[in-house]
């Protein structure tokens, strides 16, 4: 645009105004139409009209001469209306401001004025911010002096003023940057006996604690011991400010956890669990979790102050989700402490946690599941868990790996040596659910192993054990179970599977399916491998190490015991014999492990029923070790040895049979005439199967905090940067991320 155009613009605008004065909603409050040349227009030409229809449109245009009063009024108010839209506070009479405004809508002038209003507002905020900052900066030295005054009234007034300043951003920043006034606030809070002053000073620290700079200032000024002292205040508002400030410090200030512990903060916090404000309790329990995580001493302090009882009480009595979640996290941390576990269980923790397994909150359900999982190995004798067991069986249909891990592990432990729980789970379709779980997660040891352990328990020593044994077969579980013996070997899973197969073999109807699934060659292969490993360590004179927590001798015992029960079936017995196992079984008679002596003599007792096998046993030189075992203190071993000797001596000469008869009489029947009967039953006397005596491991890690004060903060709980980190294996909680 050149200079000539700029000069001509006012002239063009004036000309336009003279001819189209009333055609704009900006200049007029009346509705207008397109002007015509003669003031009216009638469509009469057929060529311009639609066929068979006629329309008449009237348009009226006023000139300046026709309505001079209106023109004068509009010219007078134009500038005022723009000014009123831009700066409404300068106008006294607002009556004409809405002449063009339809109700609920802005005029064009008002829309155009919005940026200027926003700019004006920003300028005002900036002026106020600067004023607040300057005021606070000038006032801080005097306020510091007043806070240190000896007159309680002066101190009270000063604390009230500082409290007001701490509520505004600019003045709050100035306060945080003054170590002198923060120290004065802490000192005043610690020594005042006036409740109002205590409320004001704790409120100030609470306001400062929302900023990293404020947290550091409080920490350096010795604020933590003072805040811990305020936890004994009878004033609810003081308690709330103190606990929330400590919570922020624990979350985001390095060194705060140690400072709270040294100030006996835990001893002050645990009694606060008796309060009845759910939101206050949620913050308190989260503080306990932050302090207890990875610190055994803190866990013991919580125990010593009645923490487990208070936490269980909260889980039992409240419905506030955030409180239940934070409380369950504390219990989860404590549930891996050997001292706290029994206390939680005795306080009714299993029942209280089970109450929330059907909650709509996934994070609460998962915490409860992990805690139940960790506690379950010391809760095998607990009563009142029927509903929990049924829910856990239902949870086996979940697709969540964590849920399945917890549900299977808890069921495994709660069914260990507890006949009532075994029967209840069996009657609740537990066997079928566990089989489906194994089919879906056979490649996940964290799930498959406890699931197999639970099935091992369900198939032994309770009134519905036979029902469970048959149920495995009827739900096509045998092939899936036998496949778990395939390489690569996960020894804890292999050990549990061998024990389950032994129990399944107690049911004669399962022998054929087990045979068809190829269980005998797999067991023999495992037996040979594990025995060779055990012999290798014995030859080198080194103590046999555990492989994933399992000794090879345990695999030897398990495989031999399972083959012992399978050998009751003639077809299986012949298959075992054909795999050239007798030399190995005879060698196992020399084992120093009593349980291996028992199962090896037991399987030889079964094999000796066949003449060919009995001759092979004799040819392998079994008589000598069997004669020694006749004098074993274990009646089961002595009984099996006697039975084998009796069977292999049937074809011997009279002198040999007489000598064996004397040995048998002296060793067996002198003590118990029923021993021979026991040999036929193949159940060792007073010696429960060892796998049944073991609880499934209950060691799982606690939560691992994320980096504090970062972008990883949990969106569901703004002041808490945590994510759950469940895992398997032995618990190692002493590695916190600072």
Curated annotation (Swiss-Prot):
GO BP field: canonical Wnt signaling pathway; cell-cell adhesion; positive regulation of transcription by RNA polymerase II
SMART domains: ARM (SM00185)
Membrane topology term: Peripheral membrane protein
Localization per Swiss-Prot or TrEMBL: Cell junction, Adherens junction; Cell junction, Desmosome; Cytoplasm, Cytoskeleton; Membrane
Repeat recorded as keyword: yes
Renumbered ranges of ARM repeats: 128-167, 168-211, 212-251, 254-293, 294-337, 338-377, 379-416, 419-460, 466-506, 508-547, 570-609, 611-657
GO cellular component, one term: nucleus
Main location per the UniProt record: other
Record keywords: Cell adhesion, Cell junction, Cytoplasm, Cytoskeleton, Membrane, Repeat
Entry's Gene Ontology molecular function annotations: alpha-catenin binding; cadherin binding; nuclear receptor binding; protein phosphatase binding; transcription coactivator activity
Keyword RNA-binding: no
Protein family according to the UniProt entry: Belongs to the beta-catenin family.
PANTHER family membership: ARMADILLO SEGMENT POLARITY PROTEIN
Complex formation: Homodimer.
Function: Common junctional plaque protein. The membrane-associated plaques are architectural elements in an important strategic position to influence the arrangement and function of both the cytoskeleton and the cells within the tissue. The presence of plakoglobin in both the desmosomes and in the intermediate junctions suggests that it plays a central role in the structure and function of submembranous plaques.
Name recorded for this polypeptide: Junction plakoglobin
Organism: Xenopus laevis (African clawed frog)
């Amino acid at each position: 645009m050149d200079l000539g155009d700029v000069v001509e613009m006012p002239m063009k605008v004036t000309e336009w105004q003279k001819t189209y004065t009333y055609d704009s909603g900006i200049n007029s409050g009346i509705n207008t139409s397109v002007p015509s040349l003669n003031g009216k227009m009638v469509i009469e030409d057929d060529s311009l009209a639609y066929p068979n229809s006629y329309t008449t449109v009237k348009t009226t245009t006023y000139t300046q001469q026709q309505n001079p009063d209106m023109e004068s009024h509009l010219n007078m108010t134009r500038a005022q209306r723009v000014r009123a839209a831009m700066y409404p506070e300068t106008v006294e009479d607002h009556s004409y401001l809405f002449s063009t405004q339809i109700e609920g809508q802005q005029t064009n002038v008002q829309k155009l004025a919005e940026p200027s209003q926003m700019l004006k507002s920003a300028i005002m905020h900036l002026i106020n911010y600067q004023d607040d900052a300057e005021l606070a900066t000038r006032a801080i030295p005097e306020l510091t002096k007043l806070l240190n005054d000896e007159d309680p009234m002066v101190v009270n007034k000063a604390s009230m003023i500082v409290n007001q300043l701490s509520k505004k951003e600019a003045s709050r920043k100035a306060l945080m940057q003054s170590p002198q006034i923060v120290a004065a606030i802490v000192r005043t809070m610690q020594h005042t006996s006036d409740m109002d002053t205590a409320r004001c000073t704790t409120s100030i620290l609470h306001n400062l604690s929302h900023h990293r700079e404020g947290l550091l200032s409080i920490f350096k000024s010795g604020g933590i011991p003072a805040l811990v002292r305020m936890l004994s205040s009878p004033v609810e508002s003081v308690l709330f400010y103190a606990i929330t400030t400590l919570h922020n410090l624990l979350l985001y200030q390095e060194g705060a956890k140690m400072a709270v512990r040294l100030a006996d903060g835990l001893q002050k916090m645990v009694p606060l669990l008796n309060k009845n404000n759910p939101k206050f309790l949620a913050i308190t329990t989260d503080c306990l979790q932050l302090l207890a995580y990875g610190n055994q001493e803190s866990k013991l302090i919580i125990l010593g102050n009645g923490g487990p009882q208070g936490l269980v009480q909260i889980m039992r009595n409240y419905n506030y989700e955030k409180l239940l979640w934070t409380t369950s996290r504390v219990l989860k941390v404590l549930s891996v402490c050997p001292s706290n576990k029994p206390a939680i269980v005795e306080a009714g923790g299993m029942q209280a946690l089970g109450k929330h397994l059907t909650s709509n909150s996934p994070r609460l359900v998962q915490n409860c599941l992990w805690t139940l999982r960790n506690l379950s190995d010391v809760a095998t004798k607990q009563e009142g868990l029927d509903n929990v067991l049924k829910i856990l069986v239902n949870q086996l249909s979940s697709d969540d790996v964590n849920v399945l891990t917890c549900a299977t592990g808890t069921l495994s432990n709660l069914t260990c040596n507890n006949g009532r729980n075994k029967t209840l789970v069996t009657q609740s379709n537990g066997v079928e659910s566990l089989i489906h779980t194994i089919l879906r997660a056979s490649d996940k040891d964290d799930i498959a192993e406890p699931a197999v352990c639970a099935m091992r328990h369900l198939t032994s020593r309770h009134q519905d054990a036979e029902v469970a044994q048959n149920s495995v077969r009827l739900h096509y579980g045998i092939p899936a179970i036998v496949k778990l013996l395939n390489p690569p070997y996960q020894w804890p899973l292999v050990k549990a599977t061998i024990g389950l197969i032994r129990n399944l073999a107690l049911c004669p109807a399962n022998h054929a399916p087990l045979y068809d699934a190829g269980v005998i060659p797999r067991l023999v292969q495992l037996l040979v491998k594990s025995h060779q490993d055990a012999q290798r360590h014995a030859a080198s004179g080194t103590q046999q190490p555990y492989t994933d927590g399992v000794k090879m001798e345990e695999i030897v015992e398990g495989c031999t015991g399972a083959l012992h029960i399978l050998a009751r079936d003639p077809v299986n017995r012949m298959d075992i014999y054909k795999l050239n196992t007798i030399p190995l079984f005879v060698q196992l008679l020399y084992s120093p492990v009593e349980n291996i002596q028992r199962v090896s003599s037991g399987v030889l007792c079964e094999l000796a029923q066949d003449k060919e096998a009995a001759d092979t046993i004799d040819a392998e030189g079994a008589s000598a070790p069997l004669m020694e075992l006749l004098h074993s203190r274990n009646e089961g071993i002595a009984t099996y040895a006697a039975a084998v000797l009796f069977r292999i001596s049937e074809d011997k000469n009279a002198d040999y049979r007489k000598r064996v008869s004397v040995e048998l009489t002296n060793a067996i029947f002198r003590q118990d005439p029923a021993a021979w009967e026991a040999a036929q039953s193949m159940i060792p006397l007073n010696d429960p199967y060892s796998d049944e005596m073991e609880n499934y491991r209950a060691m799982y890690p606690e939560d691992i905090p994320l980096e504090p004060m970062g972008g990883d903060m949990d969106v569901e709980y703004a002041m808490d940067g945590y994510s759950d980190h469940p895992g398997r294996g032995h618990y190692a909680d002493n590695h916190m991320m600072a």
